[in-house]
Amino acid sequence: MNKMLYIKTYGCQMNVYDSNRMVDLLETQGYNIVANMADASVIILNTCHIREKASEKMYSELGRIKKLQQSRLKAGKSKAKIIVAGCVGQAEGEEIFIREPAVNIIVGPQSYYNLPTMLEKLDSGTENHLIDLDFVEAAKFNKLPEVLKSPTVSGLVSVQEGCDKFCTFCVVPYTRGAEFSRPLEQVYREVLNIAQQGAKEVVLVGQNVSAYHGKDENGKECSLADLIKYVAKIDKIKRIRYITSHPNDMTDQLLSLHATEEKLMPFLHLPVQSGSNKILKLMNRRHTRERYLEIIQQLRELRPDIVISSDIIVGFPGEDDEDFEATLSLAKEAKFGQCYSFKYSQRPGTPAAVKQQISEEVKQHRLSILQAQLMLQQLECNQKLIGKVVPVLFDRDGKYDGQIIGKTPYMQSVCIMNEKDNNLYGKIVNVKILSASASSLFGEVCPNS
């Protein structure tokens, strides 16, 4: 039987991790990953539900897959099996079958470990539509294959899932469930596995990773700082990052680690969402503008070169011009080197969705102003490295022939022209930065690096 797998991933790094694990899981069942959807016998869309456009993208993709199915039939091939995984599957469930009957399987982010069994049922011909949206704590990690089969230079490892914060704009507590942390040793073994396969960097991921509270072998609860220090003992891991954090869970222990653990990179993604205390309260963020800036100041005192990244939502219900100005001023005061900014998107079932909404025109206007400011800030951050030598971990090819791209410790992309006899992939080498744009740095490898 032709077992060819194509997977398309939407959304956050947690989804990227889940997609990698689905590949690991199905490779044990004899599936081979393919780059072209037309060659696949199984197509997985691993979906995101954070914004409305994300779920609509999935339905648009399903429309394209239906046309592809028709072409397969005309060519004498059987239809591919279609799987909707991830947060849209969890949130919309059987409604997806109603809206798009061509879908065969729906699985949530906690239940995809059952895919082999579900695919067997489809193959037997006894079922055509299957769904599994169970929230069974820890079941996923206990039943997935432990050894990863996808060597990467920078590996994602999920350490914590779910969220208990219930921000009024967010669907994560409803699609990913309550906060759950993996045991310390289980995480360590997974990081060790990817290190043995060539990973130089590990990114510890979670919906609220700073709330990590996994237990060690003696049943003692451990913090994210404890986990980072433990993972840092793995010699082959040279760089450690973590994402995404909540300001309320940034403990003094974790903040101090940025000054003492040399493998912990001088970069932190810490979403603020708004600079207005009024809006932060409406969002149920449980922190103030002042507390957020206090954390940033503390980090810079501990690690002066740290680059701060963030998320900001504009046009949240109730946001007026004064609130928006407060957001602009916070972004400037925090000196964000990177920032992801979005228009507020109503998500069904969340408290903010039923409030009086701000017009699309106003939201777009505010977003344009904010993004222009953030672009300048990012350019200024990048330009500070011109003329300096920085260690770069090369992890991917560029879009031009001979170009290779890597990351600085500060999470900036660095582009260089790679000599054919100089294989830089997977290496950390010193690069002199020659120029910068808002999105990238450009440089050359230092001699004898």
From Swiss-Prot:
SS bond partners = none
Pfam families recorded: Radical_SAM, TRAM, UPF0004
Instruction: Name the UniProt key words of this record, in alphabetical order.
Output: 4Fe-4S, Cytoplasm, Iron, Iron-sulfur, Metal-binding, S-adenosyl-L-methionine, Transferase, tRNA processing
Q: Which residues form the signal peptide?
A: none
Q: Which residues form a coiled coil?
A: none
- SMART domains hit by this protein: Elp3
**Entry keyword Ribonucleoprotein:** no
- According to the entry, every stretch annotated as the MTTase N-terminal domain falls at 3-124
What are the required cofactors?
Answer: [4Fe-4S] cluster
Q: Which reaction does this enzyme catalyse, per its entry? A: N(6)-dimethylallyladenosine(37) in tRNA + (sulfur carrier)-SH + AH2 + 2 S-adenosyl-L-methionine = 2-methylsulfanyl-N(6)-dimethylallyladenosine(37) in tRNA + (sulfur carrier)-H + 5'-deoxyadenosine + L-methionine + A + S-adenosyl-L-homocysteine + 2 H(+)
Q: Name one GO cellular component term.
A: cytosol
Q: Which residues bind [4Fe-4S] cluster 2?
A: C163, C167, C170
Location within or outside the cell: Cytoplasm
Broad class of enzyme this protein falls into: transferase
Q: How is the cofactor bound?
A: Binds 2 [4Fe-4S] clusters. One cluster is coordinated with 3 cysteines and an exchangeable S-adenosyl-L-methionine.
A molecular function (GO) held by this record is: metal ion binding
Annotated residues that bind [4Fe-4S] cluster 1 are located at C12, C48, C87
Q: Does the keyword Metal-binding apply?
A: yes
**EC number(s) given by UniProt:** 2.8.4.3
- Location of the TRAM domain: 383-447
Protein purpose: Catalyzes the methylthiolation of N6-(dimethylallyl)adenosine (i(6)A), leading to the formation of 2-methylthio-N6-(dimethylallyl)adenosine (ms(2)i(6)A) at position 37 in tRNAs that read codons beginning with uridine.
Assembly and interaction partners: Monomer.
Q: What is this protein called?
A: tRNA-2-methylthio-N(6)-dimethylallyladenosine synthase
Species annotation = Orientia tsutsugamushi (strain Boryong) (Rickettsia tsutsugamushi)
As recorded in Swiss-Prot or TrEMBL, the protein's gene is named miaB
